[in-house]
From Swiss-Prot:
GO terms for cellular component: mitochondrial matrix. This is Lon protease homolog, mitochondrial. Residues 1-54 form a transit peptide. It comes from Emericella nidulans (strain FGSC A4 / ATCC 38163 / CBS 112.46 / NRRL 194 / M139) (Aspergillus nidulans). Homohexamer or homoheptamer. Organized in a ring with a central cavity. Belongs to the peptidase S16 family. The gene is pim1.
Amino acid sequence: MLRGQTLRWRAALQTPRSLILRPLFAPGGYNVGPRSVLETSRRFRSLPPSLRTFSSSTARRKEKPPPGDEKEDSNKKENKDNDDGTEDKEVERDPRRKQADSSGKHGSSVDPGAPTSGFARRREKAADRDQRSVTEDAKREAEAKGNSSDTPSAIPVSDSSSESKPSGSHNGGDDGGKKGKKNDKALQKPSVPDVYPQVMAIPIAKRPLFPGFYKAITIRDPNVATAIQEMMKRGQPYVGAFLFKDENADGDVIESTDDVYDTGVFAQVTAAYPLRGEQSGVTAVLYPHRRIKISSLIPPGDSTKSGNSEDKTTEKRGDVVASFEENAAELVTKDHYEPTSFLRKYPVSLVNVENLTEEPFDKKSAIIRAVTSEIVNVCKEIATLNPLFRDQISAFYTDQFPGNLSDEPAKLADFAAAVSGGELHELQEVLESMNIEERLPKGLVVLKKELMNAQLQTKISKDVEAKIQKRQREYWLMEQMKGIKRELGIESDGKDKLVEKFKEKAEKLAMPEAVKKVFDEELNKLAHLEPAASEFNVTRNYLDWLTQIPWGQKSVENFGISHATDVLNEDHYGLKDVKDRILEFIAVGKLRGTVEGKILCLVGPPGVGKTSIGKSIARALNRQYYRFSVGGLTDVAEIKGHRRTYVGALPGRIIQALKKCQTENPLILIDEVDKIGRGHQGDPSSALLELLDPEQNSSFLDHYMDVPVDLSKVLFVCTANVTDTIPRPLLDRMELIELSGYVADEKMAIAQKYLAPAARELTGLKNVDVTLTEEAIEELIKSYCRESGVRNLKKQIEKVYRKAAFKIVSDLGEDVLAEDKALTAEGKAAQEESEKETGPIESTSEQEKATTENPRVALNVPDSVHLSIGKDSLTDYVGPPIFTTDRLYDTFPPGVTMGLAWTSMGGAALYVESILENALTPESQPGLDITGNLQNVMKESTQIAYSFVKSVMAKQFPENRFFEKAKLHMHCPEGAVPKDGPSAGITMATSLLSLALNHPLDPTIAMTGELTVTGKVLRIGGLREKTVAARRAGAKTIIFPADNMSDWLELPENIKSGIEGHAVSWYSEVFDILFADLDKQAANRVWQKQLSKEPKKSNDKDDH
């Protein structure tokens, strides 16, 4: 530092430190943050100019002369003992000393912690010595400059500060002789150096710093924190702040210039406080002065290498601040100006920087004036929305713009970016922009975004406040209403009425004693609960369910046999077994006077009426009907309910059925019981065991109700397609009633009596002369709908009538019934009302007319319209036939037989084909290949049949060595359909024998039966369905096991009509029926010619 500036700094140091530090940056008084920094800046600027300079160190200053000033040191030594004696004399000799002394006293009066009078006198004495040595210092500096032009000045300062002369208690230099001249600048704020070539770089995260705006940062690196503290002690608290490119980066040292933006700010550390809870970190308050740019980086590793060569002279901890004369002397001795050389002993990042200068601009430019005005307007808008922003604008305007805003557009752009929450790169662009015309629009963009955020925040705040106010108003009104009711004596929160309602319901029900006890307990609990309590609603829902179960409520049953018969015949054709069982059930109830619940299970293929028969039974018995399906059900809670501890718990489907039916004796249909699933929530089929057990369901326990419910009076009807997938314990609890498929005669009767009339009414042809002839229905059944049920037949009949309706409307034309005549009186009134509201519609599209919701009348078809749909014209309505022949083969070749199968879809004809793969030769090897998607049981039946027929051939046809040399292939058509079951044994054996004996079979013979290896024919199931399938396939003879004779006798005559049945116990009986005309001698020699050929002598044995 120049010697000429020493007096000014010494005078500044005479200002009491506590007067400045305590109100501005006291650690206990303020938290460092945006608002505290603004407040600090405002209070700092409100101080007199003489009090704005302060030291950054709180330690006492060590009294010692500047290095190299031997005269001062000797004077100090000579006058060490005479300080007190000479003070008064010095004051008398120079009246200006009194002025300095009075200023010192003034400082002491302001700050109680000011130095004692002895210390003040010593400080005045040092100032006097400085005055006397000013001339000598100036001469010494001039001589040094003259001797070596390469030696730089100590510390360069700004032009204004170098031009201003130092002032203090005495005038130094040439002003010493000007007595009586008043100096208005007794104390001045030290100026910021205009040139500072090397600074310590501190990386900043999230957002850059802008000149003129304080920023508090946290330093956790101990080396950086220590370096900052030493910089402040040396009176050189200047750093460079540069923004991280990665917004997630963190650190206090710059490792590479690629990590930060090269444009930053030259900032002064105005204060540093230790971090709370951390020993090494500090919180530093930075005040940026100007923009700078990195020219080169000295990484931490490089800066510490030269740390040993720097001057080790440092100030002790007890000093107030290091003497500026000492620093100046240290720097003068060096060859180059390096104010940060003492930082090289720390592993911090140092950068060489250069100042950035703003490009000249015209303040009167229209663009600058327009953008400046817009920024001011946006600031005003934000200030109206955000009070904190309004305070920031007020402080900024007071500090930065003593005059007109348009005179400082650069500062205005910086302010816009500093207070906005824009993106990192947007703010950095504002900082890097040195062209004012470019910087202003960029600042305006980020400020506009801040305005949008403020508007959105205000909108959200208003919406939330409105909702809260609405709730508060409702709550206040409710409380006021309660108070009014309390004053009128009609106070009631609804709980008393609710309790009374439950009591009234319970009085109408015949609750069992155990249920009544639980009801009273829960009702008492409800009476003592607050309506706002969460358990209040749980108890209320439970009592609601408890009082909605029809305890003791029964529907009056109809035990009339004739009435039940009429109802069942009206709804269904056939189904004699089901109807007889229901009539038996009614007869028993009529004799006993009461009916106990039963569990029936209707088993049959789809479309035979299992579900609809349940509704007919309920109507015949005059019982309420409830149906639910358990197909795919995996949760036990659907049957037995959830426990009340769960949120949203409900009872099971059985309790829900009782609530809906409001009787204890409804008919509950459990559909698709064979398709019930199993999951991690449990096994619902096991839950049905208690429900469907007549010995246990008298005290069925639902998890939600937790009280026994009597289900013994409920008639349960289950439906299933097959019984194989029903668990055996569950199947044992149900009474099975099998519904076989319908034969052609039954389908014809059902179509004529039920399906056709319903389809005519559904398609609007009830009063139209449209006839579907009997031949057409027979053709539909024969060529389109061969399944066991009538569901597909119903679809085809509806399709025929729909086509007929379209044909009639097309032939009559659109003018038969105009749109204005198609509306009913109600529809016309609605249309007129709509026209009054919306006005007359000049043009209405056809689509709008077609989609009107106004009621319409039916079209009256003239009596002249007649339409008859016969067999010949059926293809015009339903397309070509699906099944063209009655059977797969009109004539069977050897090896083909027709068996019978029973599936979930009903009975079906199962053909078995066997062929010889290779020609028979003495060298050929036997074998059997099987195809047709056969499952394990059928594969075993194939092996049994193969072994059995080889035994038959060996015994009855020993000369026929067919199976010893034949490579065979057996196949069952429709390979996409999985096939399984043991009833195809005799069919496979017959197919192999027919091929071995080369004897074709009669195509009208069908067979079914399980075969053992000894030839025994065992019992099979589904004889009715298989008989129906045989009739559809055109069979006239059926071979079945003798054990199924009872099933055959129970078949209706219409099913057995035209079919001859043969019951067999051994396969020999089957052989006699099928091969009655067989010539055994010829059959013995049928393959003799092929097997007697001598083997070829050539090596080509494969040539046939």
